[in-house]
Amino acid sequence: QKTIPYRTLEYLDWKTPDWIVYPGGALGNTSSCGKCLMELYQWGWIKKIPRIAVINAEGANTLDVLYNGKFEDTELRWNNGNFDVELIERYYTKMNDDGIRPKTKATAIQIGKPSNLVKGLRALEYTNGIVISVTDKEMLDGMSVVGLNGFDCEMASGAVPAGIKKLLNDNIIKKD
């Protein structure tokens, strides 16, 4: 998974984009991208660290809930490795007690307890990243955008154009 950003940046002659956007499920791609960016920056191969945006499905948005303080009004952060493990445990307990299960048609990101949550937090901290959620309808619209260009993608990948659209509309990602 670390190869994806590596090869992309190599293709771009090590000129980094402002943003790298991933759908958020288990957060393996997010954490691998963060690790790749750390290494490339340490080696001096890239001069600027792009920001990572993680796009959760609204029905499977554990990272969005925890990262953006939607549970107990506390924003979960990597905090140089001193993340609040008790906050994660309390949220997972609430999920279990309340019968909260991930629900989205985007099955590739239909994950309630991301296995790479902590590593994802590290990547977000390192890149000054952000997390948002999009609806299933927005992901379907994102798939349509990809389709208009002659490509096909599954629903979770449709989260990326949907998230970019939302971030552009919110003026978080700037139009160039």
Task: Outline where the language-model segments fall.
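Conserved acidic residues
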Residues: D18, I52, D176
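Buried hydrophobic positions in well-ordered alpha/beta secondary-structure cores of metabolic enzymes
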Residues: Y6-T8, V21, I52, L124, ...
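A generic structural signal for well-ordered alpha-helical surface patches
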Residues: Y6, K137, D141-S144, G158-K165
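Helix N-cap/coil-helix junction residues
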Residues: W14, W45, F151, I172-I173
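Short glycine/serine/threonine-rich phosphate/pyrophosphate-binding segments
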Residues: A26-C33, L63, S157-I164
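Catalytic phosphate/nucleotide-handling subdomain of diverse soluble enzymes
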Residues: A162-D176
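Active-site/ligand-binding loops adjacent to catalytic centers
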Residues: E39-M155
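Active-site/ligand-binding-proximal alpha/beta "capping" segment
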Residues: Q1-W43, L140-V146
